[in-house]
Amino acid sequence: MLSLILTIFFVHVAIYLVNTVGATTIDTLLWILYLKLPTSTSKNAREQSRLKREVVQLKREMNNTSSQDEFAKWAKLRRKHDKAMDEYEAMNKKLTAQKTSFDWSVKIARWLSTNGLKIFLQFYYSKTPVFALPAGWFPSYVEWVLSFPRAPRGSVSVQVWNSVCATAIAVMAEIVTSMLLQLRSRSASPASTAKAQKAQ
């Protein structure tokens, strides 16, 4: 089983990734993947897509047909278009309701697996030391702060370890991002210098 130190660290990595990528992006990606599965919802999505193409095609045919010169043909196309449009709107409402239900399920699962797990770990392991500090290395007031609120003195509490992990992950992400931007700007500048020299 994963140690408490690593469990808290990976929970904070997951929280950081969700916050960085964005919950909406993750929800959309999961919805697309869900529609690839053989479910009734994916069948409804395919049917909605087919109806949309049919409505667009009938609308195009209606626009290309003169309502005065070819009224019978235009009226027949209009009836088909209206029927297809009603079916499309009904299917769209059904699919929207299914997507709303799916989004709520994903949001609940995402919260439970990230912030919910973090809160659970904080309460469940509130009296458990994450790790012990070497004796005599820190003054007693520092040991008290590191064990705050309920861990034994001379150890690091779950709450403090949560803060350390969140801060360390954010700082490391900033460092990696700035390094990547520096590398990108350095690799782009020789190419632009070479182009400028060729132009002269």
UniProtKB/Swiss-Prot annotation:
Membrane side Lumenal: residue ranges: 1-4, 132-155
Record membrane topology: Multi-pass membrane protein
InterPro entries in UniProt: Get1, Get1_fungi, Helix_hairpin_bin_sf
Broad class of the protein's primary localization: endoplasmic reticulum
Cytoplasmic topology ranges: 25-110, 173-200
Keyword set, alphabetical order: Coiled coil, Endoplasmic reticulum, Membrane, Transmembrane, Transmembrane helix, Transport
Coiled-coil residue windows: 42-100
Any Gene Ontology biological process: tail-anchored membrane protein insertion into ER membrane
Compartment list: Endoplasmic reticulum membrane
Entry's Gene Ontology molecular function annotations: protein-membrane adaptor activity
Cellular component GO terms, alphabetical: endoplasmic reticulum membrane; GET complex
One Pfam family recorded for the sequence: CHD5
Signal peptide range in chain numbering: none
Subunit structure: Interacts with get3.
Family according to the record: Belongs to the WRB/GET1 family.
Function text: Required for the post-translational delivery of tail-anchored (TA) proteins to the endoplasmic reticulum. Acts as a membrane receptor for soluble get3, which recognizes and selectively binds the transmembrane domain of TA proteins in the cytosol.
Protein name as annotated: Protein get1
Taxonomic source organism: Neosartorya fischeri (strain ATCC 1020 / DSM 3700 / CBS 544.65 / FGSC A1164 / JCM 1740 / NRRL 181 / WB 181) (Aspergillus fischerianus)
